[in-house]
């Protein structure tokens, strides 16, 4: 039996030792598949699954969300999932995993699909029918199903053969016969797409073409995905016959042509269909046109916008996915408020003259970044109507307030007994995703009294569901919510239009209808780049220029997922970009232009301009690979400096400015940032079970000069070795462990290597591995050219030939000091040759070059350029240069005795005494990290023994620091000990940290924080504690330390920290920097104190510590966090803390008493549902739906955690346990009743409907079935397993009104049992002791006279009677109008 102290213990749960507070449910679990964060989490799981080979489980979770939980929209997830197209994946490619997503039945393996799962084509039929405003005909169904069936069969064969190959160890482990079988399947699939795609849009009927276009869009996506796999994986599958270099070139041509063809086809068919709607004459035809636009946008255009990303030449495979944000907006939903012809949109006039940014359909609708919804003010009225003297509610007007203005829709009467106005405040961080409507119907003119044949209607109440599942009520009275208007998945309500009710009666000028503007949730997010995931991968990001901060003119564009920005001659535009991780990015623009146009491009990093030059935006009219849109042909253009295609961008907010310096318009779609990723040598599995070495990579003409190895051995694998070879000679050997061990190694390879192989061993050497390099490969024949890279060692020889005012880059790589360049040249004329050294695209050194030359660059540089400056007339130079990277020869270690002396002094200063068993009082954890960096820099050759001894002492200091630290994992060595936001990650390899650090990214759609609580039992009474840490970079970082009420709460601005050059006696951090507004930044090291008085083990306040980002573009990198004992409190300090603690305890006890009074009755009632009060056990046999519905969950004051806004508080956890217990009881009741969906939680599923039976929502939140009159009924035929004619059953019914339940049974002779229910209020009635003459029983619910509301019905086996019970047809009833479990959702 559940008791109070179990659910609401006197000692709250231990944050570290117990299960942490769970995340709040996504909005999708509350109402609609709305919350983008749910999709993002499932996408992360799929990405991990593809690389780990467990993708079928990840897809099964998606299918469960679609078909069981109803929290995911199929179409939306697939569209978002296509962002994985650029991932570096194993040799199976990306098409194979997606087969199980497109066709649920093919997601086999160890994770079969849900029983009711459909393929994506079947799942989108309801939307297609809604778009064409009719049901698909039998012929249309046969046509569509037949085509898709043929594709599914081909996909199944492809999948099966790929599985067979992988089960044998991969393509290099199987014979040519199996490879041929697979390539035949590949080519068959390719032929199917080529041959059958056109049939979906070539029918001679307009409807057939329109209904086929969503199919066409999905199939085109599948085809492009297959072609991309052929291009990127084909040489691995079959490089000798079907996928030779020439064949791959042919497929590259195919994918480019198909991208253009598929995009144009979708756009042309969409435009043709749009034109067929003409100019709408009323709101009904207007709404149909907008519904067409909505379905075509989400099912077709949103897919077509992604087609160019399938081209591997344009979007090559990298370490991360690709995210192209959408900003296009949709008019949806349409809500009738007051009409003359029932509550429909029919014959209702449309007036858009008062709609901002509508522009007769050619506008962009209100920009959600400029017009942010603040409040709705509704003006209702209740007055005696002209029909029957009834009080009728009307919505006179609605006032929409945004950040720009307040606009009134409708008009206020001069005199009227108004009720209101009613206010709805809108939180932009928790936007509206659904609108519910309560209606009031009135009888037609001349009728007497109430009549269900309704001809007039108005809205009596509105409520708005927010993304987190909470509901905002607009009041106005009213009864049940009978209509739900959900926005498209992952959208929110960014604006609300109104149109007047224009008639000749007294109600003219009222609001006739409301029209929502649905906006993608990412549209208002900051433009964030450089955000790593858990594996450290950084995505390619694309931001519509529609998100610009100034400039340009918005023009309608259908195909890009965003409207275009027209940049006319002389106009400028600027877009802010926030970078989380400093590094190199390729910047690209997607645009359209009818003429060659010069655009001045300025990347302003606030102190530097890495790009500040005029760029030619060439005419795109005749571009063969561009995509046609409404404003021209769109192409992608790289924005490069004169010497580098990548741009160094610091970790901060920068601004990109473009100015049209030409004479023609340029239409800007988006700006893209592609992170520089390390060259990938190999990614996939290795296996030597055949007995031969596994050659991962080899080349006849290219060498790499360094290597990064990362992987994990299989559990059955033994240890082995990796060989790096150069022309057959083993250059380096790297150990590869076995038995599930992970491994990581990185080495320079000065000699260069052109082959990587895993040595064979018995019984097996196998696992997964990623092999990369820090730098691109170099020609092994020492060929020259423009560009090059950091070859290291003696690699990197360049031939150069310059004339006139020419230049060439001979090195581009990591930032280094001491790069060595030598060579010679011949010349004509009188040349001056200059060697320019660059750092972050800025010249840091210019050195004259004479032949022969031998130059060492003394400054830090990441790029070298040879520049020819003719002194007198024309000149030429021809020569050779060899660049040697310092990563081989450059030695930064400390070798002088004074260095050893300085570092030894600093090591000893870490300790309080010579015994080294206690740290000095003022030493922080970060102090230890700075010292270890210096110890590690001591020369092994000169001070080997001393270095070893000093490192031992520093290790001891680190152990002592961890022992005194009350936080677990203060340097994130135990990441699981922290609560963290969904996108918060740990990162290594920072110049200021020896340990890992945490990256708190910009919040986005979910908060960005870390949090930990130190339990009371760990503290000492009357003691001061120090809370400290090191911030390498912090923008809008809030530091909170709380015991009795957030004693420390401070937002800091810490500029990006850059290490000083490492010296033996100087600090590691940091040159002084100012914040973005020019003020001096906060210090990198923070330290606060918090006082603990008497311990309170019962209340357990402890010390709570958290860091979080409080602004959308904030970010932070933090480590070395500590809470440690400082000193005992003085007498006056004890008195002060006692006073604070006493006040806190008073409020604490008051709140607990209030909560206890609310939850104890609920605990008692839930205990009554279960045998022995065991909430995890079985419910009692006499429990009915009404017993569950009668339990009303309380409203507790604090459901969210006080710091972590996306997690439950202790009270929220209690509510979740209550709801879980009710859900389990309900599920058991569902299993015990013979009727399916007897509670009507799934609308009228499993029931056959006659007449106008439909589901409605009552004012208290209950969903019930409404039978409006005697012509309405629902029925269900059940089949009883293990039928026994002597078995007795009980019928339990809960409803309101006058109706009957009939049970028809018998085979040769029909028997009908009738149960009558006549109650004015919601009442439970029962019929006991029923027996049946056959195993098939038809149950029918009918209305007898007027409205009959059905809450639930159950038919259950009767328990065995006791001696004093009589089961002969007993009936009973009880009245109860309490709310159901559904009102607490």
From Swiss-Prot:
Pfam family, one: Cry1Ac_D5
Coiled coil: none
CDD domains: delta_endotoxin_C (cd04085)
Membrane-spanning residues: none
Function: Endotoxin with nematicidal activity.
Similarity remark: Belongs to the delta endotoxin family.
Note: Toxic segment of the protein is located in the N-terminus.
Protein name: Pesticidal crystal protein Cry5Aa
């Amino acid at each position: 039996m559940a008791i109070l102290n179990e659910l609401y213990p006197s000692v709250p749960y231990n944050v570290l030792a117990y299960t942490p507070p769970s995340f709040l449910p996504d909005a999708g679990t509350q109402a609609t598949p709305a919350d983008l964060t749910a999709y993002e989490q499932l996408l992360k799981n799929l990405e991990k699954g593809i690389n780990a080979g467990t993708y079928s489980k990840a897809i099964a979770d998606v299918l469960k969300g679609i078909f069981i939980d109803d929290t995911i929209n199929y179409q939306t997830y697939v569209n978002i999932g296509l962002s994985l197209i650029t991932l570096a994946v194993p040799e199976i490619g990306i098409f194979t995993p997606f087969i199980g997503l497109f066709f649920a039945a093919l997601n086999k393996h160890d994770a079969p699909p849900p029983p009711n799962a459909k393929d994506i084509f079947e799942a989108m039929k309801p939307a297609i029918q809604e778009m064409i405003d009719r049901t698909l005909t039998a012929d249309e169904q046969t046509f569509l199903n037949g085509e898709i069936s043929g594709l599914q069969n081909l996909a199944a064969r492809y999948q099966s053969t790929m599985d067979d190959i992988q089960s044998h160890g991969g393509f290099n482990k199987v014979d040519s016969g199996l490879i041929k079988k697979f390539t035949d399947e590949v080519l068959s699939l390719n032929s199917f797409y080529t041959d059958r795609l056109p049939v979906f849009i070539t029918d001679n009927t307009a409807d057939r073409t329109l209904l086929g276009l969503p199919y066409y869009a999905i199939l085109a996506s599948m085809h492009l995905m297959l072609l991309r796999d052929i291009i990127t994986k084909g040489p691995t599958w079959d490089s000798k016959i079907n996928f030779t270099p020439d064949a791959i070139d042919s497929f590259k041509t195919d994918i480019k042509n198909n991208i253009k063809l598929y995009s144009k086809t979708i756009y042309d068919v969409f435009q043709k269909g749009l034109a067929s709607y003409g100019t709408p004459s009323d709101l009904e035809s207007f709404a149909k046109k907008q519904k067409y636009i909505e379905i075509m946008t989400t099912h077709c255009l949103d897919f077509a916008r992604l087609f160019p990303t399938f081209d591997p030449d344009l979007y090559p495979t990298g370490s991360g996915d690709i995210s192209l944000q959408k900003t296009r907006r949709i008019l949806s939903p349409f809500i009738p408020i007051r009409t003359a012809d029932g509550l429909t949109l029919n014959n209702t006039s449309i007036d858009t003259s008062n709609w901002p940014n509508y522009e007769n359909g050619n506008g962009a609708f209100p920009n959600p970044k400029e017009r942010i919804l603040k409040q709705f003010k509704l003006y209702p009225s209740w007055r005696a109507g002209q029909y029957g003297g009834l009080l009728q509610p009307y919505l006179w007007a609605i006032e929409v307030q945004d950040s720009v203005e307040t606009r009134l829709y409708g008009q206020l009467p001069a005199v009227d007994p108004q009720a209101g106005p009613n206010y709805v405040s809108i939180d932009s961080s928790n936007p509206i995703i659904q609108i519910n409507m309560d209606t009031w119907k009135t009888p037609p003119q001349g009728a007497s009294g109430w009549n269900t044949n309704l001809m007039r209607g108005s809205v009596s109440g509105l409520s708005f569901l927010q993304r987190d599942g909470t509901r905002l009520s607009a009041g106005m009275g009213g009864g049940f919510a009978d209509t739900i208007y959900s926005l498209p998945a992952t959208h929110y309500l960014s604006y609300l239009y109104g149109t007047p009710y224009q008639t000749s009666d007294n109600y003219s000028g009222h609001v006739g209808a409301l029209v929502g503007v649905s906006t993608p949730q990412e549209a208002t997010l900051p433009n964030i780049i450089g955000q790593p995931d858990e594996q450290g991968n950084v995505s390619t990001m694309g931001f519509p220029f529609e998100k610009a901060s100034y400039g340009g003119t918005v023009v309608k564009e259908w195909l890009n997922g965003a409207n275009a920005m027209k940049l006319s001659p002389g106009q400028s535009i600027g877009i802010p970009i926030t970078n989380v991780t400093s590094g190199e990015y390729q910047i690209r623009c997607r645009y359209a232009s009818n003429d060659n146009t010069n655009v001045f491009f300025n990347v302003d990093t606030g102190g530097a301009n890495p790009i500040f030059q005029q760029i030619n935006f060439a005419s795109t009219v005749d571009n063969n690979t561009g995509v046609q849109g409404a404003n021209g042909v769109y192409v992608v253009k790289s924005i490069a400096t004169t010497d580098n295609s990548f741009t160094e961008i610091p970790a901060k907010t920068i601004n990109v400015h473009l100015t049209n310096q030409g004479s023609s318009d340029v239409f800007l779609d988006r700006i893209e940032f592609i992170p520089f990723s390390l060259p990938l040598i190999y990614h996939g599995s290795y296996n030597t079970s055949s007995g031969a070495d596994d050659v991962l990579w080899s080349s006849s003409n290219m060498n790499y000069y360094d290597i990064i190895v990362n992987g994990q051995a299989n559990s059955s694998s033994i240890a082995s070795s990796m060989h790096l070879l150069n022309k057959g000679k083993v250059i380096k050997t790297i150990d590869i462990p076995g038995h599930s061990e992970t491994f990581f190694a990185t080495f320079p390879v000065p000699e260069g290597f052109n082959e990587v192989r895993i040595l064979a061993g018995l019984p097996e050497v196998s696992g997964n591995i990623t092999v990369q390099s820090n730098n691109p490969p170099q020609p092994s024949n020492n060929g020259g050219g423009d560009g090059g890279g950091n070859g290291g060692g003696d690699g990197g020889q360049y031939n150069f030939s310059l004339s006139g005012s020419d230049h060439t880059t001979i090195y581009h790589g990591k930032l280094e000091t001491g790069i060595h360049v030598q060579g010679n040249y011949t010349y004509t004329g009188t040349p001056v040759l200059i060697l320019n050294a660059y750092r972050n695209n800025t010249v840091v050194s210019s050195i004259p070059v004479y032949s022969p030359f031998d130059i060492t660059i003394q400054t830090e540089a990441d790029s070298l350029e040879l520049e020819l400056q003719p002194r007198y007339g024309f000149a030429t130079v021809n020569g050779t240069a060899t660049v040697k990277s310092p990563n081989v020869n450059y030695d930064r270690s400390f070798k002088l005795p004074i260095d050893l002396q300085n570092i030894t002094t600093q090591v000893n200063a870490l300790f309080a005494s010579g015994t080294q068993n206690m740290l000095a009082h003022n030493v922080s954890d970060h102090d230890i990290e700075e010292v270890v960096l210096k110890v590690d820099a001591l020369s092994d050759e000169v001070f080997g023994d001393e270095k070893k001894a000093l490192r031992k002492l520093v290790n001891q200091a680190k152990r002592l620091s961890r022992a005194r630290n009350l936080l677990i994992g203060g340097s994130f060595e135990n990441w699981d000990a922290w609560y963290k936001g969904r996108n918060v990650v740990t990162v290594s390899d920072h110049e200021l940290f020896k340990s890992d650090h945490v990256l708190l990214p910009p919040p986005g759609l979910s908060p960005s924080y870390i949090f930990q609580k130190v339990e009371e039992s760990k503290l000492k009474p009357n003691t001061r504690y120090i809370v400290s840490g090191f911030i390498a970079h912090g923008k809008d970082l809030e530091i909170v330390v709380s015991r009795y009420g957030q004693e420390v709460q401070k937002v800091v601005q810490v500029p990006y920290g850059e290490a000083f050059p490492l010296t033996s006696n100087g600090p590691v951090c940091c040159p002084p920097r100012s914040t973005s507004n020019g003020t001096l930044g906060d210090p990198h090291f923070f330290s606060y104190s918090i006082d603990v008085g008497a311990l309170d083990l019962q209340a357990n306040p402890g010390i709570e510590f958290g860091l979080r980002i409080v602004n959308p573009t904030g970010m932070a990198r933090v480590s070395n966090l500590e809470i440690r004992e400082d000193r005992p409190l003085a007498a006056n300090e004890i008195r002060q803390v006692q006073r604070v603690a006493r006040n806190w305890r008073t409020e604490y006890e008051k709140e607990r008493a209030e909560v206890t009074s609310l939850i104890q009755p609920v605990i008692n009632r839930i205990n009554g549902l279960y045998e022995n009060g065991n909430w995890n056990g079985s419910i009692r046999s006499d429990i009915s739906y009404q017993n569950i519905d009668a339990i009303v969950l309380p409203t507790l004051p604090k459901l969210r955690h006080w710091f972590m806004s996306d997690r439950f508080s202790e009270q929220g956890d209690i509510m979740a346990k209550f709801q879980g217990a009710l859900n389990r009881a309900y599920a058991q009741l569902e299993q015990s009743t013979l009727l399916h969906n007897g509670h009507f939680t799934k609308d009228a599923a499993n029931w056959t409907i006659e007449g106008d039976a439909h589901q409605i929502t009552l004012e208290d939140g209950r969903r019930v079935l409404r039978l409006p009159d005697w012509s309405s009924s629902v029925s269900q035929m059940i089949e009883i397993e293990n039928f026994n004619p002597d078995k007795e059953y009980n019928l339990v019914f809960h409803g309101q009104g006058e109706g009957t339940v009939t049970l028809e049974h018998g085979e040769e002779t029909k028997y009908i049992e009738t149960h009558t229910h006549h109650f004015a209020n919601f009442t439970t009635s029962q019929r006991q002791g029923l027996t049946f003459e056959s195993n098939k029983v038809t149950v029918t619910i009918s209305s007898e006279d007027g409205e009959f509301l059905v809450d639930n019905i159950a038919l259950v086996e009767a328990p065995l009677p006791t001696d004093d019970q009589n089961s002969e047809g007993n009936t009973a009833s009880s009245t109860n109008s309490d709310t159901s479990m559904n009102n607490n959702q």
